[in-house]
Amino acid sequence: LWFPDSFLPILEETGEVEALDYYVYEAAFLWLSERMKKQQKIIPLSLNVSPIHFRKINTFIHKVSDLIDKYKIPSQYLIFEITETTYIHNIDAVNQMIRFFQKKNIRISMDDFGSGYSSLNTLKDILFDEVKIDKRFLDDDLSEKGKIVLQEIFHLLKRTNKLIVCEGVETKEMVDFLVQENCDELQGYYYYKPLEMQ
């Protein structure tokens, strides 16, 4: 497997990342469609949205919507992820996309929360359905101060009815703490390393 850091910067420099995204979306929708036809187990797919798409947000929305319709993908199987940094630099376009897909009952996630420059105060206004906590919050092996910060973030997110996802979960200690704090979903090497679609 190639990890994104090994090729995405090159594609972003050459402007090819846009074409790659549409290729990945179509491949993902085809994969879901085939699993549905075979009545195989399906779990929701999270798909990243590159910053470049927010320059032509109407084109992006309609291309992706057409692909969803083409493969007849039920809304509960899709999640679109937008990084916190992308949101900060494209608030109006991101909100336009969120409103469009939320009308179709497709979940939108803020990825890497805590890696950018938004404040906790930002959380009360965002339209996202879920917030994915950046793994750096867990990288210090959950010091007492780190736990307090996470508890406060979780408390605020729960009060604003956001789903909470934590990435970078690697130890049983992390799992126990996050389950105790009612984190909705956990991701990380504790469960699986990246797998091929097959």
What do these predicted ranges mean?
Residues E16-A93, G168:
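Catalytic core of bacterial c-di-GMP phosphodiesterases, primarily the EAL and HD-GYP domains
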Residues L1-W2, E34:
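Short helix-loop capping/hinge motifs at secondary-structure junctions, enriched
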Residues S33-R35, S50-R55, Y77-I91, I106-Q198:
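EAL-family c-di-GMP phosphodiesterase catalytic domain
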Residues F7:
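Conserved, function-defining core regions and hallmark residues within catalytic/recognition domains
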Residues I10-L11, V24-L32, K63-V64, M97, ...:
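Structural preference for long, well-ordered alpha-helical segments in enzyme cores
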Residues L1, Y25-F29, D112, G188:
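Short acidic-capped amphipathic helix/loop micro-motif used as an active-site/signal-coupling element
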Residues K63-K70, Q96-K104, I148, E152:
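Catalytic-core regions built around general acid/base machinery
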